[in-house]
Amino acid sequence: MKYINKILSLFVIALIATSCDPDAESYTLGELEDGNQGICFAGNYTQTVEVEPGITSFDLTLTRALTDAAGTVDVTVINNEKNIFVCPSTVSFAAGEKTAKLTVEAPSAAEGITYNLQLALSGNDVSNYSSGYHEISVNFAILKWESIGTGYYLDGTVSNFFKVDPSVPMAVEIEKTTTATSTRFRFDSPFAKVATAQDEVGGFNGYPFNAEADIVPGEYTFVIDVTKEGASLKPVQYGMDWGYGMFSGGSVYGNLSTNINSYPLGVYNEKAGSITFPANSLYVSMADYQDGGAYPCTNPSYLYLSAEAYLNSLETE
């Protein structure tokens, strides 16, 4: 039987973040010409679109100020790098619609290469006094994931609720990719498996405290982004339920809080081949416990990118 070990006070802070392109020209909102709908692109002038392998299209959003009547805008391609992109020549709004989607296809794009697309809007419903951009530059890439072999994940989140050993290593197969702003690692959730064996360095091939009834069928992937700020675990479902609903977790900073001093990001040590999430860096939640409240974790979590890195960490303890 599993017993709840700690219950922290509930912590939920909504994060609202906005970003802008400091190099892009800004428009000053003025009075639109009579009858002009003020159609423009939503978002920044320069946008980055990164998709997973197998995805060969993406959507851009157009918006407008006047929505009473239907409207149409012309789309002109200014730059189509290597003729990768297929774009519609017009985008239409139905009466009452505030936004519309422009779907761009890139059927021949190769993985790991960034392609640039520049578009411009024109027509009677485009105004110099609208609030957004009439032109847009999009850098599009299909991520290229490469295996870097077996690593070891030591979890400090589940022990926030239950009396389990946070130093148990779980063997995970790690993939790596490089994005426009980060180095990214991913691996299948070890919690969605029952451990049946250990490898030569002691890593379990699943979570050793699981029974078959604890597993929630599905695909669950841990994704860690490393930027100049630090390492961040994207919100993830574990694929495990110990009677209080699905476990989930992620980084506190950027998801629940903007206070990086109280809730630090993880530390990527490239030389040591490790990522350390210190105390209060990650949160954990169970869907049916306290309305799914998210709790910062007092125990650290570690990802070692190789067996050598994990064994070296044992020698330095």
Task: List the predicted regions and their residue ranges.
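Bacterial N-terminal signal peptides that target proteins for export
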Residues: 1-8
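Acidic/polar, low-complexity intrinsically disordered N-terminal segments immediately downstream
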Residues: 4, 21-159, 312-317
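Ser/Thr/Gly/Pro-rich, low-complexity flexible regions
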Residues: 143-317
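C-terminal motif of bacterial Sec signal peptides marking the signal peptidase cleavage site
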Residues: 16-19
